[in-house]
């Protein structure tokens, strides 16, 4: 049984299949993978095309990056400066 849910809306992906989103993309995509900074999102609604999707809504993207930074700092025992060294800037 698959218990995955969209990080943003909580749906199970039955109507809109879930996609894996790397919180820090581009040059930091591999580091997102390495540190587990990925979330499942409804592919159309929450990931790519909805008005509140992370690729169309700056507030959603900022919220996810803040969440990702706090998760990384907590799990890795990092300071804000440590995070900055790994990911180039702080999102707090």
Regions found by a protein language model. Give the residues of each.
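Short cysteine-rich loop/turn motifs with clustered Cys
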Residues: 1-19, 44
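Short, solvent-exposed coil/turn linker segments
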Residues: 12-14, 25, 79
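A near-ubiquitous, low-amplitude feature marking generic local secondary-structure context
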Residues: 21-25, 55, 66
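Histidine-centered catalytic micro-motifs
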Residues: 18-26, 43-49
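Amphipathic alpha-helical interface surfaces
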Residues: 16-19, 37-38, 68
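Short linker/helix segments within small regulatory modules
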Residues: 24-39
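Short Cys/His-centered divalent metal-binding micro-motifs
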Residues: 38-64
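Short flanking/linker segments adjacent to small metal-binding domains or redox-active Cys/His motifs
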Residues: 63-92
């Amino acid at each position: 049984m698959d218990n995955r849910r969209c990080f943003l809306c909580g749906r199970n992906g039955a109507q809109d299949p879930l996609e894996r989103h790397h919180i820090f993309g581009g040059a930091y995509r591999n580091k997102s993978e390495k540190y587990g900074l990925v979330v499942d999102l409804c592919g159309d609604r929450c990931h790519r095309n909805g008005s509140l999707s992370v690729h169309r809504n700056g507030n959603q993207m900022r919220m996810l990056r803040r969440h990702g930074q706090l998760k990384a700092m907590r799990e890795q025992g990092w300071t804000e400066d440590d995070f900055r060294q790994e990911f180039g800037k702080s999102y707090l």
